[in-house]
């Protein structure tokens, strides 16, 4: 995709985005934030700092376990079966025409089938449908597969944070 080009509309009828209900969210939110802590620690952050950052974001974005205004959590559904999740939201301090992929994951049993690409194409279409002109995300350095996918979809690096243990 060339710079400035709009992504093509998402047309794959097999993968659907379905809002998660309260029961699903009650299980998904704590599990997702626990996974987030592990990812932060894998990127070199201490357990204490990772938990503190996770708790602060959870309180801000899911007060009482419910998505705050502007936050949307959906199941990736393939042929009637939930195969992953997508969390879209307004970026913290972002503009009205921007949306942020806070979380996207295809369940392990369904990986390697192109569903990650389909999920991101669906996220792009969702963003356009919701008035967005830009989509952004964070990817941890150790997630080489996801970084390759995002590169192939035309995402560009905005900043890089690096560390070295001594």
Where are the model-predicted features located?
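Acetyl-CoA-dependent GNAT
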Residues: 16-107, 126, 160-166
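Conserved acyl-CoA
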Residues: 94, 107-109, 118-134, 156
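Conserved active-site alpha-helix within GNAT-family acetyltransferase domains
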Residues: 117, 121, 129, 141-159, ...
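Conserved phosphate-binding and hydrolysis motifs of nucleotide-dependent enzymes
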Residues: 80, 84, 114-116, 154
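Conserved hydrophobic beta-strand within the GNAT/NAT acetyltransferase core sheet
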Residues: 101-104, 135-139
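Residues that form or flank phosphate/diphosphate-binding pockets in enzymes
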Residues: 96, 114, 145
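Short, Lys/Arg-enriched N-terminal segments with co-localized hydrophobic residues
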Residues: 1-13
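Active-site acidic-Proline motif in GNAT/NAT acetyltransferases
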Residues: 107-109, 113, 141-142
